[in-house]
């Protein structure tokens, strides 16, 4: 039987390890989804270079090739890209929360600037006007 102090340390280490595993799993999933997104981007680029819209194209699904119409293929890949973008953005938001929880569990201060959002077009124009003037 462990002493109360040893049990407390063990619980702390288990909690930190679980949080770190969640962070690493999310990072790995983001990398995997980004790889798929890049492959889709390559496919879209190849479809744009091929100007023969009337012909069918060969598409690889896993380990199987299927012949599909050019416009439907492009639309399908674009929908997949939108889905991947949303999924990656959702994972990144979750990752920020999980990293903050991990830092909190470790007793470290919250990362400064980690929750910043980019300026939109209107904000950027207003900032340029202010800086010029």
UniProtKB/Swiss-Prot annotation:
Pfam families: Prefoldin_2. Induction: By UV irradiation and repressed by p53/TP53. Predominantly expressed in normal testis and exhibits reduced but detectable expression in other organs. GO terms for cellular component: cytoplasm; prefoldin complex; protein folding chaperone complex; RPAP3/R2TP/prefoldin-like complex. It comes from the Eukaryota. GO terms for molecular function: unfolded protein binding. It is found in: Cytoplasm. Keywords: Chaperone, Cytoplasm. The keyword Transmembrane helix does not apply. One of its GO terms (biological process) is protein stabilization. Coiled coil: none annotated. Its main location: cytoplasm. Component of the PAQosome complex which is responsible for the biogenesis of several protein complexes and which consists of R2TP complex members RUVBL1, RUVBL2, RPAP3 and PIH1D1, URI complex members PFDN2, PFDN6, PDRG1, UXT and URI1 as well as ASDURF, POLR2E and DNAAF10/WDR92. May play a role in chaperone-mediated protein folding. Belongs to the prefoldin subunit beta family. This is p53 and DNA damage-regulated protein 1. The lineage of its organism: Eukaryota, Metazoa, Chordata, Craniata, Vertebrata.
């Amino acid at each position: 039987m462990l002493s109360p102090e040893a049990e407390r340390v063990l619980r702390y280490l288990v909690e930190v390890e679980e949080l770190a595993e969640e962070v690493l799993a999310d990072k790995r999933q983001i990398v995997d989804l980004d790889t798929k997104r890049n492959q889709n981007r390559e496919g879209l680029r190849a479809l744009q270079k091929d100007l023969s819209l009337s012909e069918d194209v060969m598409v690889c699904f896993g380990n199987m090739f299927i012949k599909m119409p050019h416009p439907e293929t492009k639309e399908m890949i674009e929908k997949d890209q939108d889905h991947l973008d949303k999924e990656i953005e959702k994972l990144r938001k979750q990752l920020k929360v999980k990293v903050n929880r991990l830092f909190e569990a470790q007793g470290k201060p919250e990362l400064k600037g980690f929750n910043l959002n980019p300026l939109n077009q209107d904000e950027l124009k207003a900032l340029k006007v202010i800086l010029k003037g």
